[in-house]
From Swiss-Prot:
It comes from Bacillus phage SP01 (Bacteriophage SP01). The lineage of its organism: Viruses, Duplodnaviria, Heunggongvirae, Uroviricota, Caudoviricetes. This is Putative gene 58 protein.
Length: 35
């Protein structure tokens, strides 16, 4: 899903916004999942 130039990615059920063209940062997902 793309919203206003942002790509919304669900990291283990947690929604994270990435800039379009930005590579997936697994660390962002890990930080989110660990909470």
């Amino acid at each position: 899903m793309t919203l206003a130039g942002y790509r919304v990615d669900s990291c283990n059920g947690c929604g994270k916004a990435y800039l379009v063209g930005e590579s997936h940062d697994r660390k962002k997902c890990a930080e989110c999942a660990s909470k």
